């Protein structure tokens, strides 16, 4: 389980989304307000952002609230497309940097909020870790993000207890799914935020219904029920 956040819009500092908001990921790492499973997200954190078309990552297996080095550098990290997460490891899963989102295939950044039985996922060398989220990410990358809707529906059918909230970014798109956990959206004048839970009390936040696919581009936001989804158009 985790809390994750994505941004697509104007260039902004990473700190403005992750550290500065009153209920941002820094606070969500120890006091989330809407988390259904787990009480804290102290098993690591990761920030990914796009440097032009190149995805960059900074990940740690330590709690976000205590990372003074990241806190000092985050205001200088700026991008038009950002994906960040704080992690609460599923019981039995390793606590290590390679198990910490965001995961990448060199083009996309991806985070998974939830849990899935690894037995329903194909084993493969592409996964960054043996944890369920990393194997799920590798499965999604293998099928392609254009098939995200179909992939989530199939995995959900194979594991009825799975929670499959995905957030992915490629520099020009944000793609997300809701499957068993919360996701909120904020349309700002300078861009769009997708987040597991609101980072402040702005009245503009709205909740995404469960079992939906969300796509954010420069043209706008599209929501599709997952039983009708075939991935981003």
Curated annotation (Swiss-Prot):
It catalyses: gamma-L-glutamyl-hercynylcysteine S-oxide + H2O = S-(hercyn-2-yl)-L-cysteine S-oxide + L-glutamate. GO terms for molecular function: hydrolase activity, acting on carbon-nitrogen (but not peptide) bonds, in linear amides. Its EC number is 3.5.1.118. Keywords: Glutamine amidotransferase, Hydrolase. Residues 2-233 form the Glutamine amidotransferase type-2 domain. The keyword Hydrolase applies. InterPro entries: EgtC, EgtC-like, EgtC_Actinobacteria, Gamma-glu_amide_hydrolase, GATase_2_dom, Ntn_hydrolases_N. CDD domains: YafJ. SUPFAM superfamilies: N-terminal nucleophile aminohydrolases (Ntn hydrolases). Induction: Expressed in log phase, part of the egtA-egtB-egtC-egtD operon, which does not include egtE. The keyword RNA-binding does not apply. The active site is at 2 (nucleophile). It is an enzyme of class 3 (hydrolase). It comes from the Bacteria. It holds the Pfam family GATase_4. Pathway: Amino-acid biosynthesis; ergothioneine biosynthesis. GO terms for biological process: ergothioneine biosynthetic process. Catalyzes the hydrolysis of the gamma-glutamyl amide bond of hercynyl-gamma-L-glutamyl-L-cysteine sulfoxide to produce hercynylcysteine sulfoxide, a step in the biosynthesis pathway of ergothioneine. ERG is one of the major redox buffers which protects bacteria against redox stressors and antibiotics; loss of ERG or mycothiol (MSH, the other major redox buffer in this bacteria) leads to respiratory alterations and bioenergetic deficiencies that negatively impact virulence. This is Gamma-glutamyl-hercynylcysteine sulfoxide hydrolase. It comes from Mycobacterium tuberculosis (strain CDC 1551 / Oshkosh).
